[in-house]
């Protein structure tokens, strides 16, 4: 399926955005918990 240039599947968008959001929240909480939140 090379026809994903103009139409990206919704499940792919949801998976990517969900992973990014969870990753950012995890990094933020981990950084603030370990005392590195102020350096971000």
Swiss-Prot record:
A biological process from GO: photosynthesis
Subunit structure: PSII is composed of 1 copy each of membrane proteins PsbA, PsbB, PsbC, PsbD, PsbE, PsbF, PsbH, PsbI, PsbJ, PsbK, PsbL, PsbM, PsbT, PsbX, PsbY, PsbZ, Psb30/Ycf12, at least 3 peripheral proteins of the oxygen-evolving complex and a large number of cofactors. It forms dimeric complexes.
InterPro entries: PSII_PsbJ, PSII_PsbJ_sf
Presence of the UniProt keyword Plastid in the record: yes
Keywords annotated in UniProt: Chloroplast, Membrane, Photosynthesis, Photosystem II, Plastid, Reaction center, Thylakoid, Transmembrane, Transmembrane helix
PANTHER family according to UniProt: PHOTOSYSTEM II REACTION CENTER PROTEIN J (PTHR34812:SF3)
Recorded family membership: Belongs to the PsbJ family.
Top-level taxon of origin: Eukaryota
Signal peptide: none
Described function: One of the components of the core complex of photosystem II (PSII). PSII is a light-driven water:plastoquinone oxidoreductase that uses light energy to abstract electrons from H(2)O, generating O(2) and a proton gradient subsequently used for ATP formation. It consists of a core antenna complex that captures photons, and an electron transfer chain that converts photonic excitation into a charge separation.
Gene3D superfamilies: 6.10.250.2070
Cellular location(s): Plastid, Chloroplast thylakoid membrane
One Gene Ontology cellular component annotation held by this UniProt entry: chloroplast thylakoid membrane
Membrane topology: Single-pass membrane protein
Species of origin: Cycas taitungensis (Prince sago)
Name of the protein in question: Photosystem II reaction center protein J
Keyword Electron transport applies: no
Transmembrane segments: 8-28
SUPFAM superfamilies attached to this UniProt entry: Photosystem II reaction center protein J, PsbJ
């Amino acid at each position: 399926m090379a026809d994903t240039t103009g139409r990206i599947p919704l499940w792919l968008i949801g998976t990517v955005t969900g992973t990014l959001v969870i990753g950012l929240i995890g990094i933020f909480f981990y950084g603030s918990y370990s005392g590195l939140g102020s350096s971000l």
